[in-house]
């Protein structure tokens, strides 16, 4: 349970050896909330074809959870038919897999190093804009997340103009913005600006263990900004 006066959903939960589907369902019940389960598409996850996607959805449909997908690369939707993708409750995507010099820069790794912050920020913004402009997604996860070597420059990097660009694109396409518990982004200022612009929000822990649904930062930001149930994403399908 939370102290908020609206129902809470953790839309960013992964199953793992530490959190199977039965454990996730029981945990959500104990916390008095609902979970959305996401999986990455790709060979490593046996999720490459329409048949794989239908099988994944059908399995999770037997449980009281929302069924999501978390692609990591631009153009992911070309690998699945529109009918198969329509079986999902939602698609969540972040900008953490950044195309870089013919490879990918993985923002979450702790040993990353890029010498020129300005070059990074320019490419990162271009990547975010591409996702919000082109990708068929419902939730933009971890907005304004920064790699560890630039995180101390958060306020310098996330100028009002850059935050406004992200917010406006999300609002224009009806993409919800995640408040990410585990990395404590975006900032209160960003959320306040987004609320004033008419954005919708989700909470996410990126949990792969019993910490899923354990919200502190999300609740604090929601309370400070004055988020209500009307500000939160609500999916058409009911679990109850």
Which residues make up each language-model segment?
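Active-site environment of divalent metal-dependent phosphoester hydrolases
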Residues: 16-20, 42-45, 74-75, 97-102, ...
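Conserved residues at the C-terminal ends of beta-strands
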Residues: 38-39, 94, 143, 235
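Extended substrate/RNA-proximal surfaces in nucleic-acid metabolism proteins
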Residues: 47-172, 227
């Amino acid at each position: 349970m939370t102290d908020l006066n609206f129902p809470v959903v953790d839309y960013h939960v992964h199953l793992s050896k530490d959190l199977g589907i039965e454990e996730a369902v029981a945990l959500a019940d104990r916390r008095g909330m609902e979970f959305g389960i996401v999986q990455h598409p790709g060979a490593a996850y046996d999720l490459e074809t329409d048949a794989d996607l239908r099988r994944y959805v059908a399995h999770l449909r037997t449980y009281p959870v929302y069924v999501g997908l978390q692609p990591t690369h631009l153009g992911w939707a070309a690998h699945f038919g529109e009918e198969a993708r329509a079986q999902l409750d939602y698609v969540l995507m972040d900008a953490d897999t950044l195309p870089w010099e013919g490879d990918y820069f993985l923002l979450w790794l702790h040993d990353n190093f890029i010498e020129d912050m300005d070059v990074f920020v320019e490419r990162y913004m271009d990547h975010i804009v591409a996702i919000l402009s082109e990708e068929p997604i419902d939730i933009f996860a971890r907005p304004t997340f920064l790699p560890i070597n630039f995180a101390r420059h958060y306020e310098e990097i996330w100028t009002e103009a850059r935050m406004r660009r992200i917010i406006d694109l999300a609002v224009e396409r009806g993409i919800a913005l995640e408040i990410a518990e585990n990395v404590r982004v975006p900032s209160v200022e960003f959320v306040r600006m987004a609320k004033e612009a008419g954005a919708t929000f989700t909470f996410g822990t990126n949990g792969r263990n019993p910490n899923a649904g354990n919200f502190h930062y999300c609740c604090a930001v929601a309370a400070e900004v004055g988020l209500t149930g009307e500000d939160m994403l609500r999916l058409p399908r009911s679990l109850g």
